[in-house]
Amino acid sequence: MSSEVDPILAPPNMAVFCDYENVAIGVRDAKYDAFDISLVLEQLLNKGKIVVKKAYADWDRYRPAKRPMHEAAFELIEIPHVSYSGKNSADIRMVVDALDLCYTKSHLEIFVIMSGDSDFSPLVSKLCENNKQVIGVG
């Protein structure tokens, strides 16, 4: 008997992309105490296996968040405030990274976009064209 998991029974692989600055602003504006990434990840694990986690922000401005995000095994992508050409720098980087993984990592079936922005409609359309499921959080 083989010890390999039947691919039909295996949970789908998932990639999570977090626009942390946008999420933090949403939490602040909603007057929540804090943002707890572990609660979000707990819910996402009901949908599949998380194999990629990337979070985008000017991490010097969000130092207290670095530790919990590291502990949750996120790759922290630095988007320096001085290089902002507008509020879309993190958005553009997220889109590029998501499409890169869409086209190069066929084992990824679910893409999670964590952001309060509605700017991601073209990305969602492109992911769906490539037979990917998309979950929006924010």
PLM region spans:
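Non-catalytic, usually N-terminal nucleic-acid engagement modules in DNA/RNA processing proteins
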Residues: 113
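Basic phosphate/pyrophosphate-binding loop/patch that engages nucleotide-derived ligands
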Residues: 138
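Glycine-rich phosphate-binding loop signature in dinucleotide/nucleotide-binding domains
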Residues: 104-109
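Domain-level signal for Mg2+-assisted phosphodiester chemistry and nucleotide/NA-binding surfaces
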Residues: 1-103, 123-135
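Short glycine-rich, flexible loops that bind phosphorylated cofactors or substrates
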Residues: 120
